[in-house]
C-alpha cells in the first residue's frame, strides 16, 4: 500500500493535519486505534489560558513573549508567534467551512461555563455553550438549570451556587429543577448505562418530542435562559437546535462527565470531512514498527497488516500522550513505543530519575505531563540527537508543555498539525 502521507492517530491533530493535506491534493491514510481524547473533551478548544507563572491571560499575542521566557520548550516558542496566530486563524476559517458551529477568535479569549459553575478561559466554543467575556454581563437575568432525574453526571444545585459567585452572573436569578422524561425509565434501573451517550441514543429514537418540549417549558419557571446537560443530539446539533426552536427558549448545553457528546460531534464532523476529501481511515489498527533509512521513514507495519508494509513519502505521528498510549511509562523509563524518539527533559524533569516525574501534591501540575517528543520549528521529530527528514510529530505526543495546566492542548494540536501540513505540502 502506497500513500503520500501516513498519519498515525485519528484525534484532533491527526484529522486536522489530514484535512489540510487532502485539501492540498495529498493522498493520506489515518491509522487509528480506539477512541481519541477529543471524544472526552468539553467541545471547547483552548489556545492558551494561562502562563506557567499561573497568571490567567486574555490576549495571546500580548502574552507570547512572557510564554517564551517562561517556557522556552513550548511548541509555540519553537514555531514562533506569527506562525501560531496564522495557523489559529487558518483553523477558524476551516471551522467555518465545515460548519462546526464554533464561536470565538484567537485575538481574545472568552469564558465558557463549566459543569460545576466555574468560568474557564478558552479560544473557541460550540455556539450552544454559554459564554461570556471578562467585561460583559450574561444577557439573561433569569436562568433555569435543569438536570435529568437519576442522572448523576450533572448537578444543577452545585452549578447554580457556584455560577452566581462570578461577576458576570451576579445579577442573575438562578433556579434549578429536573426533567423526568419517562422514556428514560429503562436506563434509570441500570445506573451503569445512564450516561450521556445512552441518553442521547434513546431520545433520538424513542422520544415523544412534544412531551419533552412541554416538560422543559413547564420546568423553567419563567426563565428566559435554560442550562441543560449535553445529552440531546448524538452525532449532530440538529436535535438540540430543534428543541431550542420548539421551546422558544434560549437553551444552552453544558458538557458532562466523559464521554462528551460535544467532543464526539466534532470528531464525527472532522472524520466525515476527511473521508469526503478522499482520505482513508484504517480504524481498529495500530502501527507497531517502522523501517528507517538515513533519517527517513520508508514504511510502517501495523498490527493487522504485519506482512504488508505501508509506504509513504511522509509520516505524521499524532498518537497522543499517555492516555492514548502514544507515550508509555514503565517503572524506570518513559518511551515513545514506535520510533524510540527523543523525549523532552528539563531541570525539573529527568527521564532517568523517577522521583522527578511527579509532584508530591496531587493537585499540582505533574512534571511528567510536560514530557513528549522533541521537535523543531517544522515539527520534525528527533531521534538520537538528529531530526528526521520526513517524520513529523504533532499534538499531545509533542513535549514541552502541560496542556491541562496552561489550557493549550487543543491549540497545540491544531497549530502543530497545520505547521506540519504546510511543511509537507511545500515539499517538492
UniProtKB/Swiss-Prot annotation:
One Gene Ontology term of the molecular function aspect: glycerol-3-phosphate dehydrogenase (quinone) activity
Q: Which top-rank group of organisms is this from?
A: Bacteria
Reactions listed under catalytic activity: a quinone + sn-glycerol 3-phosphate = dihydroxyacetone phosphate + a quinol
Q: Which cofactor does it need?
A: FMN
Keyword set, alphabetical order: Flavoprotein, FMN, Oxidoreductase
UniProt keyword NAD, yes or no: no
Query: Which Gene Ontology biological process is one annotated for this entry?
Result: glycerol catabolic process
The EC number(s) this enzyme carries: 1.1.5.3
Q: Give a yes or no for keyword Phosphoprotein in this entry.
A: no
What is the enzyme's class at the highest EC level? Answer: oxidoreductase
InterPro entries, alphabetized:
FAD-dep_OxRdtase_2_FAD-bd, FAD-oxidoreductase_2, FAD/NAD-bd_sf, G3P_DH_GlpB_su
Instruction: State the Gene3D superfamilies in the record.
Output: FAD/NAD(P)-binding domain (3.50.50.60)
SUPFAM superfamilies in the record: FAD/NAD(P)-binding domain
GO CC entries: glycerol-3-phosphate dehydrogenase (FAD) complex
One Pfam family from the record:
FAD_binding_2
Q: In which pathway does it act?
A: Polyol metabolism; glycerol degradation via glycerol kinase pathway; glycerone phosphate from sn-glycerol 3-phosphate (anaerobic route): step 1/1
Describe its function.
Conversion of glycerol 3-phosphate to dihydroxyacetone. Uses fumarate or nitrate as electron acceptor.
State whether it acts alone or in a complex, and with which partners, per the record.
Composed of a catalytic GlpA/B dimer and of membrane bound GlpC.
Stated family: Belongs to the anaerobic G-3-P dehydrogenase subunit B family.
Which HAMAP family does this one have? Glycerol3P_GlpB
- This chain's protein is named Anaerobic glycerol-3-phosphate dehydrogenase subunit B
Amino acid at each position: 500500500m502506497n500513500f503520500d502521507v501516513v498519519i498515525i492517530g485519528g484525534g484532533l491533530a491527526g484529522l486536522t493535519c489530514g484535512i489540510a493535506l487532502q485539501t492540498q491534493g495529498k493522498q493520506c491514510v489515518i491509522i487509528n486505534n480506539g477512541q481519541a481524547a477529543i471524544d472526552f473533551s468539553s467541545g471547547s478548544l483552548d489556545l492558551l489560558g494561562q502562563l506557567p507563572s499561573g497568571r490567567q491571560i486574555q490576549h495571546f499575542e500580548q502574552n507570547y513573549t512572557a510564554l517564551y521566557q517562561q517556557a522556552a520548550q513550548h511548541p509555540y516558542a519553537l514555531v514562533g508567534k506569527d506562525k501560531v496566530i496564522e495557523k489559529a486563524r487558518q483553523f477558524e476559517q476551516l471551522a467555518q467551512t465545515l460548519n462546526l458551529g464554533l464561536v470565538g477568535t484567537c485575538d481574545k479569549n472568552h469564558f465558557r461555563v463549566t459543569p460545576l459553575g466555574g468560568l474557564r478561559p478558552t479560544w473557541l466554543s460550540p455556539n450552544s455553550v454559554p459564554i461570556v467575556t471578562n467585561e460583559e454581563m450574561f444577557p439573561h437575568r433569569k436562568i433555569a438549570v435543569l438536570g435529568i432525574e437519576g442522572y448523576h453526571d450533572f448537578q444543577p444545585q452545585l452549578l447554580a451556587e457556584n455560577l452566581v459567585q462570578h461577576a458576570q452572573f451576579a445579577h442573575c436569578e438562578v433556579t434549578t429543577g429536573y426533567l423526568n422524561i419517562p422514556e428514560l425509565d429503562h436506563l434509570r434501573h441500570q445506573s451503569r448505562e445512564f450516561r450521556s451517550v445512552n441518553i442521547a441514543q434513546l431520545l433520538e429514537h424513542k422520544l415523544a418530542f412534544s412531551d419533552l418540549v412541554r416538560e422543559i417549558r413547564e420546568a423553567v419557571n419563567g426563565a428566559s435562559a435554560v442550562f441543560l446537560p449535553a445529552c440531546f443530539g448524538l452525532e449532530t446539533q440538529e436535535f438540540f437546535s430543534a428543541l431550542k426552536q420548539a421551546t422558544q427558549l434560549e437553551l444552552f448545553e453544558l458538557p458532562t462527565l466523559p464521554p462528551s457528546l460535544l467532543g464526539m460531534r466534532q470528531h464525527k464532523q472532522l472524520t466525515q470531512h476527511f473521508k469526503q476529501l478522499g482520505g482513508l481511515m484504517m480504524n481498529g489498527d495500530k502501527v507497531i514498527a517502522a523501517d528507517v533509512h538515513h533519517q527517513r521513514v520508508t514504511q510502517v507495519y501495523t498490527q493487522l497488516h504485519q506482512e504488508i508494509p505501508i509506504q509513504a513519502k511522509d509520516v505524521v505521528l499524532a498518537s497522543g500522550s499517555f492516555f492514548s498510549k502514544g507515550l508509555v511509562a514503565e517503572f524506570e523509563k518513559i518511551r515513545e513505543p514506535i520510533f524510540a524518539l527523543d523525549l523532552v527533559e528539563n531541570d525539573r524533569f529527568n527521564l532517568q530519575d523517577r522521583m522527578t516525574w511527579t509532584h508530591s501534591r496531587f493537585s499540582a501540575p505533574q512534571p511528567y505531563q510536560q514530557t513528549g517528543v522533541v521537535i523543531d520549528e517544522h515539527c520534525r521529530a528527533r531521534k538520537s540527537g538528529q531530526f528526521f527528514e520526513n517524520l513529523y510529530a504533532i499534538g499531545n505526543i509533542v513535549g514541552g508543555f502541560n496542556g491541562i495546566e496552561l489550557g493549550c492542548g487543543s491549540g497545540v494540536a491544531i497549530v502543530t498539525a497545520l505547521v506540519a501540513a504546510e511543511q509537507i505540502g511545500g515539499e517538492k
